[in-house]
């Protein structure tokens, strides 16, 4: 009701009523109507309410969703909105105690099971969406929850699009960011594997062309096969490197060895 009244007041103020004089709040409201507008709805039904009031006053909102839109995905499609989708999933129900388990509803258990499929439902329905760290108990959960969403059907290509092109397009700044093209800001990551592989690490982060080292690629942690030439013949070892100063060699005997590293050259001792 308050939002609707503000829209009506702003429309009235456009007529420049003499009795009102200068109203900086309504003037600013009218001046900013051309900007992208985000409505934090956080629920499937609130999404539809936000869209209805937007339709009433000619505004296409960008809607910040919740985690239950998969339950009414056709209605979400009908809004023609771009959504901002969080990756915050409900915690598992505590059913260890049979007395507590009696009060856990089937709806809650189904939502716990299906919430990670929310983003995949948007992709399947052809609804444009971005991904956000909003609502997470810790931003450190983002990659774990993102990988879980991919296990539930969200494609790698759509993830990249939802983190880059779609946000930039939605905010009207795709001419500056959102892809690696000549003339755009050089904002990108370099990893030692697939960005979505839990074992991969971010090595460099480029921000507007400036390089920031996250993990130096000179660190050679890993497992290696080594052949040593000796007068009695070749000896084969497996090297397990876990730190920058020590290595374990496995062969006929297990040896704890120290090593030093100079760039790409390693010396064992």
PLM feature spans:
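Structural motif
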Residues: 40-43, 64-67, 134, 227-230
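Glycine-enriched alpha-helix->loop->beta-strand junction motifs that scaffold or abut catalytic
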Residues: 54-60, 77-84, 126-128
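Tryptophan-anchored aromatic micro-motifs
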Residues: 217-238, 245-253, 259
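Active-site-adjacent beta->alpha loops and helix N-cap segments on the catalytic face
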Residues: 68-79
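C-terminal cap of metal-dependent C-N hydrolases
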Residues: 185-217
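Polyanionic/metal-chelating signatures
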Residues: 1-65, 195, 201, 207
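His/Asp/Glu-enriched, well-ordered alpha-helical/loop segment
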Residues: 36, 82-191
């Amino acid at each position: 009701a308050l939002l609707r009244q503000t829209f009506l007041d702003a429309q009235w103020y456009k007529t420049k009523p003499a009795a009102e004089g200068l109203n900086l709040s309504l003037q600013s409201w009218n001046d900013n109507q051309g900007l992208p507008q985000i409505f934090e709805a956080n629920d499937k039904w609130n999404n539809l309410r936000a869209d209805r009031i937007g339709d009433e006053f000619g505004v296409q909102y960008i809607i910040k969703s919740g985690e239950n839109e998969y339950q009414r995905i056709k209605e979400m499609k009908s809004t023609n909105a771009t959504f901002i989708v969080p990756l915050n999933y409900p915690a598992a129900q505590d059913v260890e105690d049979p007395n507590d388990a009696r009060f856990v509803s089937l709806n809650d258990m189904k939502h716990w099971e299906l919430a990670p499929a929310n983003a995949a439902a948007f992709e399947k329905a052809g609804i444009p969406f971005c991904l956000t760290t909003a609502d997470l108990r810790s931003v450190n959960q983002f990659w774990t929850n993102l990988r879980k969403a991919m296990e539930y059907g969200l494609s790698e290509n759509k993830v990249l699009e939802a983190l880059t092109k779609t946000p930039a397009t939605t905010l009207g700044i795709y001419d500056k960011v959102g892809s690696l093209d000549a003339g755009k800001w050089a904002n990108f990551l370099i990893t030692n594997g697939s960005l979505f592989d839990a074992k991969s690490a971010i090595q460099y982060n480029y921000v507007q062309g400036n390089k920031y080292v996250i993990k130096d690629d000179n660190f050679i942690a890993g497992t290696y096969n080594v052949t040593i030439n000796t007068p009695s013949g070749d000896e084969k070892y497996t090297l397990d490197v876990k730190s920058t100063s020590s290595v374990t060699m496995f062969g006929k005997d297990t040896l704890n060895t120290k090593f030093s590293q100079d760039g790409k050259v390693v010396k064992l001792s």
